[in-house]
């Protein structure tokens, strides 16, 4: 009697294992079926999109009646057309870009404002993930910058309660390598808002009027995507002092500056658009650009003192693989007159000395050699006297 029972038990176990195996395969096939269904639906949608009729891009010129509008198609002619019932007609103001039906020319939907490719590239500049803790020796400057840029965007009711108008922008000025661009990147990465990174020299165009048009489009984009921060680096490229004599190129740069002044403080207010400008030549800037109402606060970022240099050096030396005790105070004592970029270069040179010695780590002697080497190269630099603006 025992043998048939054992045989039946073995058969049961065998069938149970087969059942589990088939059940596992069934689950895999169900997952595959879901994935294939998704791919099928995506292919169907793509096919419908390819088979659908295109639409004409137009621009609203004038509203005639409650239902009729004059629009101008991109290919030239003007039409009196109707509008879909679902669309909010109050948004169809003159200048609005719309999509028109191919056959009836009915306004089907709104289109966003046309953006210049240069402005689009500015808006997609990644500021990186920079925190305020990564900026050493500039605690006072960080506080002043956050009061002007961050506070009006995050807590505008504070200004309303006090009864003052929030500042529009600020100017960061000081010697090269002191962290002006790094400060702007930190503000942009800490705030959840749009960020336009503008290199001022790239705005200047060889064709008359193109530079001013780019400034207009830049500010229009910022107003459409509020809250927005516009960071203009090396502003002295277009913000130089105006003079009567000069070539046609100089006059074109002056026209660009006048457009910038108008956009910053014209009739069309900026609301939640903030300006940060940076330069290492504040003495060359036009007085109209520096007045309150355009750049309300001027933040001087000077060369770091001994304590600030120590903080900056520790930040730069943080990721480096070190061996033994590192005397940062001794290194800082040899770095008189260094800026933040120079201290970063000291860490890089120390790493290069370690590689030259076939080490996987940096020791105190490498830092001492590096700081002496950077100090020797600093003697070649010319010095500017930065007076308060």
Swiss-Prot record:
Signal peptide: none
Keyword Metal-binding: no
PROSITE patterns listed in its UniProt record: AAA (PS00674)
InterPro entries given in the database record: 26S_Proteasome_ATPase, AAA+_ATPase, AAA_lid_3, ATPase_AAA_core, ATPase_AAA_CS, NA-bd_OB-fold, P-loop_NTPase, Prot_ATP_ID_OB_2nd
SUPFAM superfamilies reported in the protein's UniProt record: P-loop containing nucleoside triphosphate hydrolases
Modified residues (N6-acetyllysine): 72, 206
Single GO term (MF): ATP binding
Disulphide bond pairs: none
Modification sites for Phosphoserine: 244
Annotated Gene Ontology cellular component terms: cytosol; nucleus; proteasome accessory complex; proteasome regulatory particle, base subcomplex
Binding site for ATP: 174-181
Xref: PANTHER family: 26S PROTEASOME REGULATORY SUBUNIT (PTHR23073)
Function: Component of the 26S proteasome, a multiprotein complex involved in the ATP-dependent degradation of ubiquitinated proteins. This complex plays a key role in the maintenance of protein homeostasis by removing misfolded or damaged proteins, which could impair cellular functions, and by removing proteins whose functions are no longer required. Therefore, the proteasome participates in numerous cellular processes, including cell cycle progression, apoptosis, or DNA damage repair.
Assigned protein family: Belongs to the AAA ATPase family.
Assembly, per entry: Component of the 19S proteasome regulatory particle complex. The 26S proteasome consists of a 20S core particle (CP) and two 19S regulatory subunits (RP). The regulatory particle is made of a lid composed of 9 subunits, a base containing 6 ATPases including PSMC6 and few additional components. Interacts with PAAF1.
Protein name: 26S proteasome regulatory subunit 10B
């Amino acid at each position: 009697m025992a043998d048939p029972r054992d045989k039946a038990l073995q058969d049961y176990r065998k069938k149970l294992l087969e059942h589990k195996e088939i059940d596992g395969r069934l689950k895999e096939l169900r997952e595959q079926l879901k994935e294939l269904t998704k791919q099928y639906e995506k292919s169907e949608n793509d096919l419908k999109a390819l088979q659908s009729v295109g639409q004409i891009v137009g621009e609203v010129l004038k509203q005639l009646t409650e239902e009729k509008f004059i629009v101008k198609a991109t290919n030239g002619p003007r039409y009196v057309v109707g509008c879909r019932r679902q669309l909010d007609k109050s948004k169809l103001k003159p200048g609005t870009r719309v999509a028109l039906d191919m056959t009836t020319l009915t306004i089907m939907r709104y289109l966003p404002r046309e953006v210049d490719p240069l402005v689009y590239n500015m808006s997609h500049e990644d500021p990186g993930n920079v925190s305020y803790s990564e900026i050493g020796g500039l605690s006072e400057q960080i506080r002043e910058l956050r009061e002007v840029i961050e506070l009006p965007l995050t807590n505008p009711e504070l200004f309303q309660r006090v009864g003052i108008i929030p500042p529009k922008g600020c100017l960061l000025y000081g010697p090269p390598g002191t962290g002006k661009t790094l400060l702007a990147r930190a503000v942009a990465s800490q705030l959840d808002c749009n960020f336009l990174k503008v290199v001022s020299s790239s705005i200047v165009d060889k064709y008359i009027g193109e530079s001013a048009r780019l400034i207009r489009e830049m500010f229009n984009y910022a107003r459409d995507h509020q809250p927005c921060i516009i960071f203009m680096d090396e502003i002295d490229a277009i913000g130089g002092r105006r003079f009567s004599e000069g070539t046609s190129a100089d006059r074109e740069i002056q026209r660009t500056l006048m457009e910038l002044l108008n956009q910053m403080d014209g009739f069309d207010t900026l609301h939640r658009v903030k300006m940060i400008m940076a330069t290492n030549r504040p003495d060359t800037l036009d007085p109209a650009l520096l007045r309150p109402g355009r750049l309300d606060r001027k933040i001087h970022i000077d060369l770091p003192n001994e304590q600030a240099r120590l903080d900056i050096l520790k930040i730069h030396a943080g990721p480096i693989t070190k061996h033994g005790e590192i005397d940062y105070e001794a290194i800082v004592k040899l770095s008189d007159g260094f800026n933040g970029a120079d201290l970063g270069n000291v860490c890089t040179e120390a790493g290069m000395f370690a590689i030259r010695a076939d080490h996987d780590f940096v020791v105190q002697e490498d830092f001492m050699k590096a700081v002496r080497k950077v100090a020797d190269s600093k003697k070649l630099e010319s010095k500017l006297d930065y007076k308060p603006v």
